[in-house]
Amino acid sequence: MNRILIIAFLLLTATAFCGERETIRDAHGKVVGTATTDGNKTVYRDAHGKVTGTATTNGNKTTYRDATGKAVGTATEAGNRTTYRDAHGKTVGTATESGNKTTYRDATGKTSGTATNTGNGTTYRDATGKTVGTKR
């Protein structure tokens, strides 16, 4: 379950610089998708290039949509903390940044994983510290 949460957070929180494409890999280095940002919109694709969803940012709020365009959730930033909500507004998790590390917690506050940024990418780990993916 934690692996699924981390991969979901990875896909939901993957950001890129304007016009830049980032490759998302699993723990074994296999490409599982990409995130391409242009302006305030990010398009997520699976390993085969099929669109799996989008994210549009306006101010401190990002709205996530599935491949059909249906809103599936939001992320609202306040300082170093981001709160994730489902399509009904219920909190499903948070992300708190401290230095080069982001800690992800579920709705109950239990740590579900971390992301550590380095000069050349991000490494994602589950609650036990096991690497579950990377982004370059």
Regions of interest found by a model, annotated:
Residues 4-15:
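Sec-dependent N-terminal signal peptides
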Residues 19-136:
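Repetitive, compositionally biased segments used for assembly/scaffolding
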